[in-house]
Amino acid sequence: MKTFLLLLLVLLELGQAPGALHRVPLSRRESLRKKLRAQGQLTELWKSQNLNMDQCSTIQSANEPLINYLDMEYFGTISIGSPPQNFTVIFDTGSSNLWVPSVYCTSPACQTHPVFHPSLSSTYREVGNSFSIQYGTGSLTGIIGADQVSVEGLTVVGQQFGESVQEPGKTFVHAEFDGILGLGYPSLAAGGVTPVFDNMMAQNLVALPMFSVYMSSNPGGSGSELTFGGYDPSHFSGSLNWVPVTKQAYWQIALDGIQVGDSVMFCSEGCQAIVDTGTSLITGPPGKIKQLQEALGATYVDEGYSVQCANLNMMLDVTFIINGVPYTLNPTAYTLLDFVDGMQVCSTGFEGLEIQPPAGPLWILGDVFIRQFYAVFDRGNNRVGLAPAVP
């Protein structure tokens, strides 16, 4: 018995309590930016969202800048109701609500995605409260309902979620995802809704109050997964660097500095960042990002900042120093490869985003960062664990 208890304590310390790991496969698909660029509609999006890409910034502040989702490529499947109705979602640590399209939605985006039918679910309960989430220059609005939500064998009972009845603009029409499942802290939730992971903890569905994210770098994304209830040491090398959460809303942490090459260029006296699976790129204050683009030799062309694909081996590394530990992105890691009219195009994975006080200014470490560094989100100790991801 003592041996078993000792083993259990060791496994708990490793984030691997017996039966703790519930793995949600994440598929990697073509990003919305690539789709719109191929259809010649990307410039139209910039104009519709009041975006000035030459300045790399959103002109208008928003609760959820729509630009964050342009390069999202990692998606998972959930089901809502009895019998289950399936939806493809972004698992987003930068927000806290779950929403999917409603059968009552008349927006163009709802015509191209699965919609939730409350009348077809025997476990559905009407809550009736309205909700609204600001995206760029438009709002996603709807009503709140409650039903059981299942994620790879974990079934949350009585989960309140948003049923969108209006989705802004034409952007979501082309998106690969139907909705968003937020994994941020409750303070971010619109309408005072309890987030899905909080209900998982309250209903004792996870052995440990943590989840982790592995995003594969290979084009097909095979092996990418979200893990509830712990973390998988096979996805990273070395030890996790545990970083305290500085504010319990986003998964917000402190940066000690940002190096370009061997020189500290930003945050020499420290600054704040969030680790965000719902943001595809790495973002920062627009002025800082413009300086960074210039230091990397990136030039502005049409719809963003590009670099010469042949020059990657001569470009500078970018290093984020977090809790005293350097996290270095080489040019191959922070550069996005695309094909336009049959030609290879390389762009940087950095974008300017103005986040106004009191929430900002903030840097956002999105998927470009998380692909290189395995991320563990520990609600029990309010900390984020980071370690080099195993390819």
From Swiss-Prot:
Residues 74-387 form the Peptidase A1 domain. It is found in: Endosome. One of its GO terms (biological process) is proteolysis. Its EC number is 3.4.23.34. Residues 1-19 form the signal peptide. Disulfide bonds join C105-C110, C267-C271, C309-C346. Expressed abundantly in the surface and foveolar epithelial cells of the fundic and pyloric stomach mucosa, and at very low levels in the spleen. It comes from the Eukaryota. The active site is at D92, D276. Gene3D superfamilies: Acid Proteases. InterPro entries: Aspartic_peptidase_A1, Aspartic_peptidase_AS, Aspartic_peptidase_N, PEPTIDASE_A1, Peptidase_aspartic_dom_sf. It catalyses: Similar to cathepsin D, but slightly broader specificity. GO terms for cellular component: endosome. Glycosylated. The nature of the carbohydrate chain varies between cell types. Belongs to the peptidase A1 family. Homodimer; disulfide-linked. This is Cathepsin E.
